[in-house]
């Protein structure tokens, strides 16, 4: 556990890297669905034959929460340059207590409370977003901004995001840094919303419309937002009907029957 935490501690809060020539497999919310993860890996290949980026929400709700997150940690240890994992809103101490990840740890381990605390220490060292360049395109802008939730009205430049401190204990942050972090983990796009930014129905973070997204994308010098956080029956969706915002949710809705066709997005040149 300490070894994988050390890897994350060396990574910046906002990753920046080039899009692989053979593409990048983007995996959305898994929520303890180990079968879904294995299906995606079997379909696309294990590293180093493929590179993966995970959008967060590995725990809570599913049947194999502990097994899934430990498996992802093992993959990160084995292939650190081929596995990128971002923090989601459920990778949080309080959220894990309110849902069922804490109880899963208690049932799995003799000292479950310690395991829960240690895993959350690892979560707090994870990066929360990434900027991905497409070197095959000559442009003054990078291609993708990737996070779990969405954008913030305070994201006026990249340094506003890159200066968020790790580990991500909000008590160690300035107010604006905490607000940006909350939006990165909790924000949602809303097609019919009139205001650029409005209070989220989730009681944390803000929702944003197309105009707000375009302004923030220009400020960050990127063209497309890729995010998770929301379930859609098709697994992926273009939130505004164009290429400015994609949502990826890999596991099925846990209120529905088991769906063997796990969803993912391939970001390619």
Predicted regions and their residues:
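Feature recognizes metal-dependent phosphohydrolase scaffolds
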Residues: 1-269
């Amino acid at each position: 556990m300490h070894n994988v935490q050390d890897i994350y501690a060396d990574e910046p809060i906002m990753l920046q890297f080039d899009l692989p020539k053979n593409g990048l497999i983007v995996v959305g919310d898994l929520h303890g669905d180990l079968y879904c993860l294995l299906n995606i890996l079997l379909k696309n290949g294990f590293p180093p034959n493929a590179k993966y980026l995970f959008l967060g929400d590995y725990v809570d709700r599913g049947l194999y929460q502990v097994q899934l997150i430990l498996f992802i940690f093992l993959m990160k240890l084995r292939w650190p340059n081929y596995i990128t994992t971002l923090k989601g809103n459920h990778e949080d101490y309080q959220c894990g207590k309110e849902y069922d990840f804490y109880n899963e740890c208690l049932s799995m381990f003799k000292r479950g409370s310690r395991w829960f605390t240690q895993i959350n220490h690892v979560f707090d060292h994870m990066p929360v977003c990434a900027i991905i360049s497409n070197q095959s395109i000559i442009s003054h802008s990078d291609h993708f901004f990737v996070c779990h939730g969405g954008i913030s009205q305070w994201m006026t430049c990249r340094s506003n995001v890159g200066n968020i401190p790790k580990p991500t204990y909000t008590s160690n942050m300035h107010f604006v840094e905490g607000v940006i972090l909350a939006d990165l983990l909790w924000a949602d796009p809303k097609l019919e919303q009139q205001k650029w930014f409005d209070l989220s129905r989730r009681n944390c973070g803000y929702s944003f419309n197309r105009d707000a997204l375009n302004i923030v994308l220009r400020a960050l010098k990127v063209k497309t937002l890729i995010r998770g956080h929301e379930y859609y029956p098709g697994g992926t969706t273009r939130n505004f009907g164009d290429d400015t915002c994609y949502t990826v949710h890999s596991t099925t809705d846990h209120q529905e029957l088991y769906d063997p066709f796990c969803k993912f997005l391939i970001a390619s040149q």
